Amino acid sequence: MSYSYAEKKRIRKEFGVLPHILDVPYLLSIQTESYRKFLNADDAKGRLHSGLELVLKQSFPVESKNGQYELHYVDYQIGEPTFDETECQVRGATYDAPLNVKLRLVVYNKEALPSEKVVEDIREEYVYMGDIPLMTTNGTFIINGTERVVVSQLHRSPGVFFSKDDSEEGAFSARIIPYRGSWLDFEFDSKGIIWARIDRKRKFCATVILKALGYTQEEILNRFSDSKTISFNNKGFALKLDDLSSMKGEVLKFDIIDEKDNTIVKKNKKLTSRDIKKIKDAGVDSVAIDFDLVSTLRVAKDIVNEATGEVIAYANDDVTENLLEACVEAGMLELEVIDFITTERGRYISDTLKYDLTKNTDEALVEIYKVLRPGDPPAAASVKALFEGLFFIESRYSLSDIGRMKLNARLGSDNVSKDIYTLENSDIVGVIEELINIRDGKGKVDDIDHLGNRRVRSVGEMVENQFRIGLYRVEKGIRESMSLVHKDKLMPKDIVNSKPITAAIKEFFTSGALSQFMDQDNPLSEVTHKRRISALGPGGLSRDRAGFEVRDVHATHYGRLCPIETPEGPNIGLINSLASYARVNDYGFLEAPYRKVVNGKVTNEIEYLSAIDEDHYVIAQASTKLDKNNHFVEDLIQCRSGGEAIFTESSRVQYMDVSAKQMVSAAAALIPFLEHDDANRVLMGANMQRQAVPTLKSEKPLVGTGMEKIVARDSGNCIIARNAGEIAEVDSNRIVVKVDTEKSKTSKLVDIYSLTKFKRSNKNTCINQRPIVNVGDKIEAGDILADGFATDFGELSLGHNLMVAFMPWNGYNFEDSILLSERIVKDDKYTSIHIEEFTCVARDTKLGPEEVTADIPNVSESSLAKLDESGIVHIGANVEAGDILVAKITPKAEQQLTPEERLLRAIFNEKASNVADSSLRMPSGTSGTVINVQVFENDKGGKSKRALKIEKELIDKARKDFDEEFAVIESVVKSSIETDVIGAKIQKAKGLKKGAVLTKEFLATLPFSKWLEISFEDEKLEQKVQNAREYYEEAKIAVDARFEAKKKSIMQSNELSPGVLKTVKVFVAIKKRIQPGDKMAGRHGNKGVVSRVLPVEDMPYMEDGTPVDVCLNPLGIPSRMNIGQILEAHLGLASYGLGKKIEQTLEKTRKAAELRKTLEEVYNSVGDKKVDLKALNDEEILNLCENLKGGVPIATPVFDGAKEEDIKSLLKIGGFATNGQMKLFDGRTGKPFDRHVTVGYMYMLKLDHLVDDKMHARSTGSYSLVTQQPLGGKAQFGGQRFGEMEVWALQAYGAAYTLREMLTVKSDDITGRSKMYKNIVDGKLTMNVDVPESFNVLRNEVRALGIDMDFDYSSEEE
């Protein structure tokens, strides 16, 4: 078995029993694949018929109203972005690229129109059609400098859906939902009448739609009902039994009697196959029925007197005595009637036609027009155009390929081609037929929550829809321009205005509900955000109206959506996460992978099934036992079939799960022993991992699940090797790899990776990359070269391993509080760096421009000490609350001066008092170090000194970077040919004769560029040198070009908003240690707040003197039912013990053979999965042991983890009691505690709910405008609300004066509080109380009602 570079350094012992069949697919593919299909940026020949290509092809050609011009689409190109991703974030720009569309304008001869089209001219050119945002490599968008994610949406799939309203008997309904266009509903009422609605407007008879489609009343009846023939004579009425098979299963309304008057089948009996045989054997071909039954029937088709041509009755007329007499008079003794006798099926349409007052197609069209356009006079042309535009014109109505596929599949017909996206007559007829079948109990209604009826709309599709909206507006503009512009040589550019496209796309990305500010607390929160599936948003549900069924877990979620990870609160169940192995198919339906079972043998062939396909199969669980030949061991197996859990014979199984973790999401798959936790707590655990703050130094979890490396790899925060090779150079900013050209099959000799340093994330956490490789290390493609934030050796590391004791300690762990050891604070375990961005904007005001300057009136020298001459803080300055970051003055209006002030001004030449200090200051409660300053200015006033200094520093840094990069390339090229050329014979060289041998000494005198000018006699060597020469020259040109581009980008002027003269951004790094009040959590939903940080000497300690790090309340476990944390603590303790064992071996000996024995015992004595230690050389073994001293990392995958026996065995090897308990001593007294305590290692996280961000106290601040009460909340620097219950408390104590103070001078008594301030300044202790402002507000509101209420100032004594 081969291990990657990072794995060799620290192999994780794995406990899973199940075989590894399929790798977890790339976690961000739902984002990247969707947008790749939309951009479709391949060359025109290889383009898919989707995304931009599809929209442009559907929208063009555009024809002018008079037919003289036609604009055709030919091709499109996506240009290069102006700035790269990093530059866009710095400048606050959008990472996008121009879309240029090649359009062909065809001009026809005006004279020949409209009879024929004679081409007069064809003009073709590329037209700019707006900017399209590009997706970064990690699946995000940079919009106005901030990273955003477009969340995928789960919405109802286009197609037809049948449902039942439980509130009314027989109220079945059908709804045809298109991808875009009008909805069409059909519904039954309690009387059995079928109604139709268009776009949920007023209902009308369903037969009106059929008539509008061109069907006559007779054709409608013929299509939806059977007919029977009744003959009549003097004896009575007889019903012909011509088609007995169609009557099978129906309840008879009459007796069937043979010629001898024997009853063959009795009335009210359900007709069976045996009965039909009896009737046929008896030779009965008709049966007598009475007039009461005949009078309930209706005529099946128009009855016409053939002799006179007179219409005796119309189709659907009731059979009456008069009608029968008229038939007899006309010589007709047989009558074709609608079959209500053997079946009720025909009655629904017949009854509906009775309600329908329209007679023909024209009347039906008018009726529909009246419903949709009430009040408009119906004109013949507009009536027909409206109806056709509703369902039959592709530009206005489209089922899309999904809708057409679903409609055909549901109706069970392939009559309509898959390429027809509008409705056909047969679709509407088929839907009504199926609805009647369901009403008759012959069909099933649809489950709307089944994932076969809900599809995922990903980012590419949403942007495509926005682009289509914008293009539709452009299309209208083109038509108008064609008719208005009168130009001899009209070109496509003259008639295309791309602004609507840019506006539509900008609106979607900046203010769309599904375009969200990326959650960037840690790599997991990024990955989870990109894999989120929301049922909310435009075209989706609203959280107020969503019921319990929609939110609940459905059987089809298995392997597609995670049943665990969803938010708590109003969005529960509406926002889901994609399961680990799930993918979205071409139609937008979620698919899960399964292993195929052939003839009882489980193969390694993988098939992805959608929820619709899965319903037809029997699927075994991943944990089902198999023998050596992959046959099932047991005869009876637990399986899933049609959404039910069943036990069935192994011979019936068709598929098997791929992995035990395939049902849960990436976040839930990170929780070890998930299977032992209550689902509610796991939900909290999965959600809280996303809130973990990356700490100063990341530490891997001792007990993991094996999913850590997958999440870290796919998050894009680690640097991954593109090619195999050797590390040539490493520092904190860059890693240089000398590429192994044979292994990587590339001509590139050098790979250079730049590291991200101290960058601010969206959540103000710090993104920093650290190299984990050393010079000379050999690496393979795909190896991790550098850790990102919250990763350790390429594994996700959100917290730290702490030694936990489950015991109470003096009430400090009451109600989930956490008692921490001071050692954790000293070791900076949970110290995190937060980077805050402060922005100062200088604007052009009415009174004059604001100015950033160090010359500020009435500010002491000490306050300006940290600023440079431009008035901007120095990088590296330590700033406290209230310190000036950017000094700025704002002009204020001139005021009238007294003669004295004018005199002073004249003497001292003072002009500064007409400006106000509006400097950017450090907010209260914060302090930190300035780590970066950015200055953006418009070009008008020229650049300030600080801006020029920053610009020069950036250019110098870029020059140095590119020079170093080229030096590395040069050294690599040099080393690739040096050994071959020394000692070779020369063909031609300056300073040497032909045939001379090249020496090392001669080469040392030449610069490397001159080496490459030497030619050699050996042809092979000459070719090699020639290749090196070409590569060297190309690299030089490329590096120089990149430097020039970078320089141009640095010097390029900044586009500031109108009225803005200058923007200064100051980045301050704030160090936050853990302290009481901070929130911490484990991975099992076990959260709490730090109550006290205890000195190490006072903490409980073990017999060997090791103090514990944390005390947790044991009462927090039984009621929460998250037992996984106990198992984690036990296994963590075993892991720690194994690490100690390895450390002891290292202290005794550093011989590889001895170390291998210890490692063999540690890794391979327990569990089924073995570690191949022979794959590591002696040096790697030694390195591995050094890295394992703190504990041996263990992977216990979800639903396939370590068993109790395994944990006990490991505890034994680690030298601990198998029950995981031990004797602890009180750190304060040294006495042992009465009982043994469970002690173990648990992985704990610091969450982004820090006390520093929440603690706040108001001194003086702003007041509400209306009530004049202090504002509330930290953001407004507000006060604490003294609410109703607090007032009761003071009343209960009888503290009248304190209460008066609270309600008046400390709140909204304006005059009182200003007097109070004056009295405090003067040293007086009196208090004058006036009327609170809120009382004045109340008084004015009462006056507004016409009641004069006033306050009586007089006292009772007067």
Swiss-Prot record:
Reactions catalysed: RNA(n) + a ribonucleoside 5'-triphosphate = RNA(n+1) + diphosphate
InterPro entries to which the protein is assigned, alphabetical: DNA-dir_RNA_pol_bsu_external_1, DNA-dir_RNA_pol_su2, DNA-dir_RNAP_su2_dom, DNA-dir_RNAP_su2_hyb_sf, RNA_pol_bsu_bac, RNA_pol_bsu_CS, RNA_pol_bsu_protrusion, RNA_pol_Rpb2_2
Cellular component GO terms held in the UniProt record: DNA-directed RNA polymerase complex
Domain of life (superkingdom): Bacteria
Pfam families to which the protein is assigned, alphabetical: RNA_pol_Rpb2_1, RNA_pol_Rpb2_2, RNA_pol_Rpb2_3, RNA_pol_Rpb2_45, RNA_pol_Rpb2_6, RNA_pol_Rpb2_7
GO BP terms in the entry: DNA-templated transcription
UniProt KW Metal-binding keyword: no
GO molecular function: DNA binding; DNA-directed RNA polymerase activity; ribonucleoside binding
Assembly description: The RNAP catalytic core consists of 2 alpha, 1 beta, 1 beta' and 1 omega subunit. When a sigma factor is associated with the core the holoenzyme is formed, which can initiate transcription.
Protein name, entry field: DNA-directed RNA polymerase subunit beta
The encoding gene: rpoB
